């Protein structure tokens, strides 16, 4: 069986929809992670209103200037720390982790672990 890139994307989207439906049923605030080959994005979204409460990305000038390359584990760790600090400053301490269908491996795992180190619980 040969998988094309299109099939991988469709499978990832299908996995992400299943997890989002489960998280929405719980009514929990969720930490959504998205990654591309060059950048990492993390958002904390309220489940009821679907509004972004906290956002951090490697596209931000302060973060981008302090990193040599924005698509590696070092950048993911920095995003994890920043998103956790911003969430804790707004009074958000417990979230559900939404990995958007990506494997819990590599940059996604590093982002989650660095957010936990700062004090975000999920």
Swiss-Prot record:
Keywords: Ribonucleoprotein, Ribosomal protein, RNA-binding, rRNA-binding
One cellular-component annotation, GO: cytosolic large ribosomal subunit
Superkingdom of origin organism: Bacteria
Disulfide bridge map: none
Pfam families, sorted: Ribosomal_L18p
This protein's record includes keyword rRNA-binding: yes
InterPro entries: Ribosomal_uL18_bac-type (IPR004389), Ribosomal_uL18_bac/euk (IPR005484)
Any one GO BP annotation for this protein: translation
Single GO MF descriptor: 5S rRNA binding
Transmembrane segments: none
Signal peptide: none
Role description: This is one of the proteins that bind and probably mediate the attachment of the 5S RNA into the large ribosomal subunit, where it forms part of the central protuberance.
Assembly mode: Part of the 50S ribosomal subunit; part of the 5S rRNA/L5/L18/L25 subcomplex. Contacts the 5S and 23S rRNAs.
Listed HAMAP family: Ribosomal_uL18_B
Protein family: Belongs to the universal ribosomal protein uL18 family.
Name of this chain's protein: Large ribosomal subunit protein uL18
Source organism (scientific name): Buchnera aphidicola subsp. Acyrthosiphon pisum (strain APS)
